[in-house]
From Swiss-Prot:
One of its GO terms (cellular component) is cytoplasm. GO terms for biological process: exon-exon junction complex disassembly; nuclear-transcribed mRNA catabolic process, nonsense-mediated decay. The keyword Cytoplasm applies. Interacts (via N-terminus) with mago and tsu/Y14; the interaction is direct. It comes from Bombyx mori. InterPro entries: PYM1, WIBG_mago-bd, WIBG_N_sf. Residues 122-137 have a biased composition (Polar residues). GO terms for molecular function: RNA binding. Residues 1-27, 118-142 are annotated as: Disordered. SUPFAM superfamilies: Pym (Within the bgcn gene intron protein, WIBG), N-terminal domain (SSF101931). It is found in: Cytoplasm; Nucleus. Residues 139-192 form a coiled coil. It holds the Pfam family Mago-bind. This is Partner of Y14 and mago.
Length: 193
């Protein structure tokens, strides 16, 4: 909480909070306050009745437990700690130590990497498209290929009309595959019929 605000009185006798400077350097305007006003910072926090009741109990004992019983329990506790099972024997409690792993994290990672096998990706051969044709539905594949052919023809028309002067690398690749797509369409038509 902040420090209590100092009020000032003007010539009329009314109270006001003087202008203050913010952390960023700007100034707050002086504020006129009514009689009996308590600033938000100075309003005491709300405490429930239960909290107030617990605050009044200084001993912190559970309900119904008398201080005499507590004193007796503390005496017994103190006596237990001073009594040793065998005179002259010192009892030390050792904490359980965690076993250190013989293999460190770096060595584990090195072992895992040694077990891994690296294989070069194989390039798809010409036989792969024919296998994919047989796997998928031929009518869907035919429809897809016709769509690609329309896109290629649309690109060619754009180039002829002069709308597309320099096609991208992807567009050039697409147009170079026109003959392959036409061949595939013919193969699919023959397989369907």
């Amino acid at each position: 909480m902040s420090t209590p605000t100092a009020y000032e009185h003007d010539a009329d006798g009314s109270k006001f909070i003087p202008a203050t400077q913010r952390p960023d350097g700007t100034w707050r305007k002086p504020r006129r306050i009514k009689e009996g006003y308590v600033p938000q910072e100075e309003v005491p926090l709300y405490e429930s009745k239960g909290k107030q009741f617990r605050a009044r109990q200084n001993d912190g004992l559970p309900v119904g437990l008398t201080p005499e019983i507590v004193a007796q329990a503390q005496k017994k506790k103190g006596q237990r700690s001073t009594i040793q099972p065998i005179p002259g024997m010192i009892i030390t409690v050792e904490k359980k130590k965690k076993k250190k792993k013989t293999v460190t994290g770096v060595e584990e990672a090195a072992e895992k990497l040694a077990k891994c096998e690296i294989q070069e990706p194989t390039l798809p051969s010409q036989s792969v498209p024919t296998e994919s044709i047989s796997q998928s539905d031929p009518t869907k594949r035919l429809k897809n290929l016709r769509k690609k052919l329309r896109e290629i023809e649309f690109l060619e028309e754009k180039i002829k009309a002069g709308l597309l002067k320099s096609p991208d690398k992807d567009q050039k690749e697409k147009m170079s595959k026109k003959n392959e797509i036409l061949n595939e369409i013919d193969i699919l038509k023959n397989s369907i019929l």
